[in-house]
Amino acid sequence: SVLALYEDRAVLYGANGGEKASYDFGGSTLVDVDTENGGVALLLSGGQTCTAVLLDNGLNVQYSGNVPAASHILRAADGFYLLTDSTVECFNKAGEFQWTQPMDAKPQAGVLNGRQLLVFSGNTVQQVTAPEPDSSSAS
């Protein structure tokens, strides 16, 4: 199968060249796409809102919902990450916010290496993990 991305939709073509499945962007603009971990993650922009869409490898919707404005999306086995102007945001498969990690410079790209998230910003590569629980609030 081949995944083709057009201005207004994603199309999955079979070995014979026929269209097997498609997903319409609904008038939104494609910002970013990631095809790791058994499916497709789309980041769409529709004016003031950004939408994250998780599709399985047959382009069936697993999740679709509004998310903070971002420049990149990374599909993980257990959810997805968004790279914004100043943070990395983590969401589970149901689109529920998990954590945020501030970055010193704007994240320009990210790579998932197994369960490790590597983020490129400025001239550095940084491994990003969930923040440690705040122990100062424990009494």
Predicted regions span which residues?
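Structural motif
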Residues: 8-13, 48-53, 87-91, 124-131
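A short beta-strand motif characteristic of beta-propeller blades
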Residues: 18-24, 58-65, 96-101
